[in-house]
Amino acid sequence: MEELDLRQIRRQINDVNDEMLKLFVRRMELSAKVASYKKAHNMPTLDRKREEDILQRVANCTEDEYRQYALEFFRYMMDISKQYQETIK
């Protein structure tokens, strides 16, 4: 791989990172709305069934090569979301 090619690939990765950051912020904003709803209705932060459904969908939609990493990514993202939801008053 030539250095120029590496720079181009890294620029593309930076672009993807920028898109992912925007989506992350949007997801956290929605998580805050979920937290407010759950608090107003005396519901727990954790919804195991919802998490299982999300992970099953991720597993079904991800190629074998990336599946374990996608699942790990989504588990971590859901953990962060739960932590954040706990801070919502």
Briefly describe each language-model feature range:
Residues M1-K89:
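Domain-level signature for soluble enzymes in the chorismate/prephenate branch of the shikimate pathway
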